[in-house]
A protein has these predicted regions:
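Conserved FAD-binding catalytic core of PHBH/FMO-like flavoproteins
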Residues: 1-126, 130, 135
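Hydrophobic transmembrane alpha-helix bundles
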Residues: 18-26, 79-84, 102, 116-127, ...
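A sequence-level detector of short, solvent-exposed, charge-rich linear segments
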Residues: 27-38, 42, 46-50, 67, ...
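Well-ordered, non-transmembrane segments within structured domains
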Residues: 72, 133-142, 267-270, 276
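Conserved mid-domain beta->alpha element of the FAD-binding
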Residues: 18-19, 126-207
């Protein structure tokens, strides 16, 4: 591997390269085009996100389905909240004053029981495009792609970090087996094992996105179908269990103890929802 640092050219000889350099990194771009198949879906909307100096007014995430578009309330710390609005894909942050953001946020997030997010000073705001992306296979020779270098999910399902951690766990097991026993078994299985999990997350994230967002070409039929989906989800134990399992994340197919890590923790799942 050759690179320049401080104006000087350097060379590093290594057994493997872990491509954990993100969606815009050089690792995936270094793979010959014919060796990769790219699957991609770009959504016709984006998320306008804000960081706010205000204590969370709820200890749960709140997903809001509203006739004006999706909104999300989340927590960053005891003193900072993070909120999102669905906006057009070509929207620019410069078009949104702080007052306009709060007007729209309160319109979409104020619940029937009177709950609403605490208004505070906006300390950061940005617009993030929505896409689903997978590059396969996730291995080319001795280069292994991991995390956003190999896949992007729409953030509605909150799966991006989970997938990256699962990739690295699988890769760690492969490296451990190679250096301890000289076997390539887990490295050879890396791409197939990870992609199975990636496509499950893509399916869930696409469903969450489709269920909660307004699409430009939505008909009255589509809107009523979305409401029926949410009605079923919030009134069926089976549906809520399925959502919780997928949202929290299915157990990794890689045993944690196999790479010297603590056993995978378990936790309860709770979800708040507001339908406007």
């Amino acid at each position: 591997m050759r690179f320049r640092l401080g104006g000087d050219e350097h060379q590093v000889r290594c057994d493997f390269i872990a491509g954990c350099d993100g969606f815009h990194g050089i690792c995936r771009a270094s793979v010959p085009g014919a060796a990769l198949t790219v699957y991609e879906r770009t959504y016709p909307f984006a998320w306008l996100g804000i960081l706010v100096e205000a204590p969370p007014s709820c200890d749960e995430l709140v997903y809001a389905y509203h006739e004006r578009g999706f909104a999300l309330f989340s927590m960053r710390s005891p003193a900072v909240t993070r909120l999102y609005l669905q906006v057009p894909a070509d929207d620019a942050i410069e078009r949104w004053s702080d007052d306009a953001i709060w007007d729209e946020m309160l319109t979409r997030l104020t619940a029937l029981d009177g709950w609403k997010p605490t208004v505070g000073r906006i300390i950061q705001k940005n617009v993030t495009p929505m896409r689903g992306f997978v590059a396969a296979p996730m291995r080319h020779g001795r280069l292994f792609l991991a995390g956003d270098a190999a896949h992007i999910v729409p953030p509605t399902g909150a799966k991006g970090l989970n997938l990256a951690a699962s990739d690295v766990l699988a890769l760690a097991r492969g490296f451990k087996a190679f250096y301890e026993s000289g076997t390539n078994e887990w490295l050879d299985r890396y791409s197939d094992l990870c992609l199975r999990r990636v496509w499950r997350a893509q399916r869930f994230s696409a469903w969450m996105t489709s269920a909660l967002h307004r699409f430009p070409d939505d008909s009255a039929f589509d809107r009523r179908r979305q409401v029926a989906d949410l009605d079923y989800l919030t009134n069926s134990d089976a549906a809520m269990t399925s959502l919780a399992e997928q949202y929290v994340g299915s157990p990794s197919e890689i045993a944690f103890e196999s790479v010297g890590l603590p056993e995978q923790p378990t936790g309860k799942f709770r979800l708040g929802a507001s339908v406007g």
